[in-house]
């Protein structure tokens, strides 16, 4: 069975709820999921995971200078090299994500090979578009194994 590590940084709980919804979706597709806060995530959590989800709420001005919050940035610096994992970035936001994903990737530079999927939502649940995107990602992962 494939497995996923879902890491998250949440300010008011919205990103945590989004992470839980992603985990439920993965579990419904027979992928075991573990959700771990960036405050609690350690190197051993990455072992055995086929895919790693990195989630953070969008910090910054309403429509400019979007970026991950400092706690997530510090976590990214300590993340081990995980070039053998499929990577998904996700964020919750109020108005726009702007440069959020670009900034997240910058902080993971040298730790990951590529980002396979980027998910975003204004709500603490996956949208129908998110579900279709994740479904396509899972299909591509299963075809390559």
Segment roles from a protein language model:
Residues 38-41:
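Conserved SAM/SAH-binding loop
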Residues 17, 25-29, 34-36, 48-145:
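FMN-binding flavodoxin-like domain, especially the glycine-rich phosphate-binding loop
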């Amino acid at each position: 069975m494939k497995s996923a590590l879902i890491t998250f940084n949440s300010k008011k709980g919205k990103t945590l709820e989004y992470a839980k919804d992603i985990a439920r979706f993965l579990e419904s597709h027979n992928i075991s999921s573990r959700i771990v806060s960036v405050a609690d995530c350690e190197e051993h959590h990455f072992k055995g995971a086929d895919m790693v989800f990195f989630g953070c709420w969008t910090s910054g001005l309403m429509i400019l200078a979007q970026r991950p919050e400092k706690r997530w940035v510090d976590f990214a610096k300590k993340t081990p090299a995980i070039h053998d994992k499929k990577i998904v970035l996700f964020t919750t936001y109020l108005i726009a994500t702007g440069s959020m994903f670009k900034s997240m990737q910058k902080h993971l530079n040298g730790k990951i090979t590529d980002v396979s999927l980027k998910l975003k939502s204004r709500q603490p649940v996956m949208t129908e578009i998110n579900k279709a995107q994740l479904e396509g990602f899972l299909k591509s992962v299963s075809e390559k194994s």
